[in-house]
Swiss-Prot record:
Involved in the secretory pathway as part of the exocyst complex which tethers secretory vesicles to the sites of exocytosis. Plays a role in both the assembly of the exocyst and the polarization of this complex to specific sites of the plasma membrane for exocytosis. Also involved in assembly of the spliceosome. Pfam families: Exo84_C, PH_EXO84, VPS51_Exo84_N. Residues 1-120, 203-228 are annotated as: Disordered. This is Exocyst complex component exo84. It comes from Emericella nidulans (strain FGSC A4 / ATCC 38163 / CBS 112.46 / NRRL 194 / M139).
Length: 666
């Protein structure tokens, strides 16, 4: 074994050790046995340990060689191509994936899902898929809270939309007014440039004699007239420049326009509160030939550290309001007062006050001196100035109309159509001079108003519709329609008012129809909406909207019940009921076979059967037409109805007696 070496596959194995049977120890071993055993063990311990160590080392080396592997060519892992990247999910569907399950399933939910406004603003959002993925693991309470959050977002969005509409409408009105002012200034500049061009052209003409030219005397008279007009214009320009220096901010209200001049300037006035008649601030009134300027008196800033300052506090005038004379009315508040009312008005000083009405806004001004004639002078001058202005505008309009007659009838028709179709009526578009404006006035409650007043009323109507003040909007539409019907002699104003009012009425009717559809289940709201639509003249639209809403509800309920009770279950139920009904009819026919048809007993039995069928009809099972269908009497049998036999009368008597005994016997 030593010559061939050690191997694990050697067939010459050592014999297995045999374990001897246990030997009982009955007494101590002999003394000569212990040394011998110990001596032999000691002698063989050195050689045995060395042989065991060498054999153990060789065996472990062979085991390592047996279970080890040698690779001649190691694969090159560094030279392998890179792993391809995962494709990105589109951003529109990034949040629509299924919710990943959490590692820790908590007993309590993490709360309702939040409302993602960014996702809801996406117009291409797949709503069904989004809601399904969002509420996949939500409880009933979470879904209810999420629904309430969506309602709050909807209400907040609706409120923001209404506020934005109102703000945009107000800004649009303000911008349109500024555009009108800018348009007037541009036309004024155009006219001034035209006059300048004409003057330069006239100066370029030579002084050659003309046989058609006037004489020297005529030239002198015309030159004097021109010089007087020029002097008057220069004087008016000086007045305006002085006004600009005296009243701060008046130049933006009253720019330099040819022919504009000051007619009357009066002070010592106070603006009053229209509700309490208490003075607000001292004002200064300036009446021009085409405008009325109101300037407020305010104190100047004074250096208190200056010791030389003495006397009253200096004041300055600041322009606050300026209105065209065509847009205002001036009323004497003390003209129609009598008796105790006049005495009370005199105590308050109202007899010296005037009211300036601009559209629907009143402004009250009172003179400080009660015995002064400033109020009467202001009223007389105002009326005379307004009359002169109207006469001038009328003459200029007639002259412009005569010059434009050569354009023909079609041009007039086209201008009228453009006037009616324009969203914002402006009669100054066809004229080059702001003074060449056709004056279209209407009579409103005994007062003359122009079409700007109509535009202001239409603007208020738009604001009422935007703020959903439906009662005020419907009342304003009725009032404007009544006003248009009264303008029989003014076709242009009547057409303009009807066009604008009909457009707003159609818009308001659409809003009310949608409200009627949303609240058709509430009687009070439905009645209110129907009344408003009837007043607007949209009865047919109200009827169709209400009936369509009710039809949609009925169709929805029918679909709901059909989903709850499929056709298979319905057919089985009807089949079961028909089977039992046929069995009952057969039993009833068999029981009444021994009774004569048409007799009293027969008829009583049929009546009882129909009463029982009526009870079933009360719970929704109507078998009245099918119960005892073949036992009904014909018309001939009813006419030839037999009399009750003796046995039948006896049976009926016993039955009546039994019923009477049951009722009163106990």
């Amino acid at each position: 074994m030593d010559g061939r070496g050690l191997t694990l596959r050697s067939k010459n194995r050592r014999p297995r050790p045999q374990i001897s049977a246990p030997k009982p120890i009955s007494g101590p071993l002999p003394q000569n046995h212990q040394p011998a055993a110990s001596g032999s063990g000691t002698a063989s311990s050195g050689s045995g340990s060395r042989d065991y160590a060498s054999s153990n080392h060789a065996t472990s080396d062979l085991v390592k060689r047996r279970y080890s592997t040698r690779f001649n060519q190691v694969p090159d892992f560094d030279g392998a191509p890179p792993v391809p990247s995962v494709p990105q999910v589109p951003s529109a569907y990034a949040g629509l994936g299924p919710p990943q399950p959490s590692r820790k399933q908590s007993a309590e939910s993490s709360g309702p899902p939040e409302v993602d406004l960014t996702a809801l603003r996406d117009p291409s959002l797949p709503v069904d898929r989004y809601v399904t993925n969002l509420l996949a693991n939500a409880s009933e309470d979470d879904i209810r809270e999420y629904q309430q959050a969506l309602r709050k977002v909807k209400n907040r969005t609706s409120t923001d939309l209404q506020q934005n509409v109102y703000q945009n409408r107000t800004q649009f009105i303000r911008i349109s007014q500024e555009a009108d002012k800018l348009k007037g200034e541009m036309k004024t500049l155009r006219s001034l440039m035209a006059e300048l061009t004409t003057a330069l052209g006239q100066t370029a003409i030579g002084d050659s004699p003309n046989p058609m030219s006037p004489t020297l005397d005529e030239r002198a008279s015309k030159r004097s007239n021109r010089s007087s007009v020029a002097n008057l214009e220069s004087m008016w320009n000086v007045q305006l420049q002085t006004l600009w220096k005296t009243v701060e901010g008046s130049q933006k209200f009253l720019p330099m326009v040819p022919g504009r001049h000051i007619v009357l300037e009066t002070g010592n006035w106070a603006e009053l509160d229209s509700a309490t008649w208490k003075p607000r601030r001292p004002v200064h009134l300036v009446l021009l030939n085409d405008h009325l300027l109101v300037a407020a008196k305010k104190r100047k800033r004074v250096d208190q550290s200056n010791p030389n300052h003495r006397g009253p506090v200096p004041t300055k005038l600041i322009a606050e309001e300026c209105w065209p004379l065509q847009d205002i009315d001036m009323i004497d508040l003390g003209a129609n007062l009598t008796g105790s009312a006049r005495e009370e008005a005199e105590d308050r000083g109202i007899t010296n006050a005037v009211c300036v009405r601009v559209g629907s806004k009143p402004f009250t001004y009172r003179h400080d001196k009660r015995n002064s004639t400033a109020k009467s002078e202001l009223l007389a001058t105002f009326r005379k100035t307004v009359e002169d202005l109207r006469r001038t505008l009328r003459s200029e309009t007639e002259a412009a109309g005569k010059n434009g007659e050569s354009l023909g009838f079609m041009s007039a028709i086209n201008s009228r159509n453009s006037l009616l179709c324009s969203p914002k009526l402006d009669l100054s578009e066809n004229t080059d001079n702001p003074r060449d404006r056709p004056e279209v006035r209407i009579d409103v409650d005994g007062k003359q108003q122009n079409l700007r007043w109509v535009d202001s009323q239409v603007d208020e109507l738009d604001i009422d519709i935007a703020l959903q003040r439906f009662e005020e909007a419907v009342s304003n539409i009725d009032r404007l329609r009544k006003l248009a019907r009264g303008l029989k002699g003014n076709a242009v104003a009547q057409d303009v008012i009807n066009t604008k009012v009909d457009e707003r009425a159609a818009k308001l009717a659409g809003i009310l129809s949608r409200s009627l559809v949303d609240t058709h289940g509430f009687p009070v709201a439905t009645k209110t909406n129907v009344v408003w639509l009837t007043r607007l003249g949209f009865e047919d639209q109200a009827r169709e909207s209400y009936l369509k809403a009710r039809s949609d509800v009925i169709s929805k309920r029918i679909r709901t019940y059909q989903q709850c009770f499929p056709s298979v279950m319905t057919s089985a139920c009807i089949k079961w009921a028909k089977h039992h009904l046929d069995a009952f009819n057969a039993l009833l026919t068999r029981q009444l076979s021994s009774v004569q048809r048409g007799a009293t007993v027969w008829q009583n039995c049929i009546n009882i059967v129909h009463e029982q069928a009526g009870i079933l009809a009360e719970v929704g099972v109507d078998f009245t037409d099918l119960v005892a269908k073949e036992l009904e009497l014909t018309e001939e049998e009813k006419a030839a109805r037999p009399e009750m036999t003796r046995s039948e009368s006896l049976i009926m008597g016993l039955a009546d007696a039994a019923s009477f005994f049951n009722m009163y016997g106990h």
